[in-house]
A protein has these predicted regions:
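Rossmann-fold cofactor-recognition segment
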Residues: 45-59
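Residue(s) in the substrate-gating loop at a strand-loop-helix junction
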Residues: 126
Length: 148
């Protein structure tokens, strides 16, 4: 897929894979990269537009979508990883809130823009969704890829 000149949104763009995805999109000539983060993010490239967005806050996510004029590529990257043994309901709920329902909320909020541009959605999942580790089984549940 060519993203030269396209508008790209990366969630979880403040560090790690998300930050690398922003750099990669810029390197491939994206015209605009929206960097979705929970905390404000400064970036030296003028093509980067920081968007303060907590994916677990549906109202904020919807409001953020209203700030974006057009979007061609949505990269759902935001995620968390916590140690758990499935006996801690709070850890399971946190994984689901961010890694499953957060992805859902972002996709729903930006879907009208993507439909208009006939855009693309990329969900960044984990190999641990295919082979869960005993130290973090709850992480694997919402990150599992699904096929139609």
């Amino acid at each position: 897929m060519t993203i030269a000149g396209k508008a790209v949104l990366v969630t979880g763009a403040n560090r790690g894979i998300g930050r690398a995805l922003v750099v990669e999109a810029l390197g491939r000539g994206a015209g605009r990269v929206y960097a979705g983060t929970r905390q404000p993010l400064a970036h030296p490239d003028r093509r980067v537009t920081p968007l303060t967005m907590d994916v677990t806050n549906t109202a904020q996510t919807q409001a953020t979508a209203g700030q974006v004029e057009s979007l061609d590529v949505l990269i759902n990257n935001a995620g968390i990883w916590l140690f758990d043994d499935l006996s801690d309901r709070a850890a399971l709920e946190r994984h689901l809130a961010v890694n499953f329902f957060g992805t859902y909320a972002v996709t729903q909020a930006f879907l009208p823009l993507l439909t208009r541009s006939q855009g693309t959605i990329v969900n960044n999942v984990s190999l641990m969704s295919l082979a869960a580790l005993p130290l973090t089984p709850a992480y694997s549940i919402p990150r599992r890829p699904h096929s139609p």
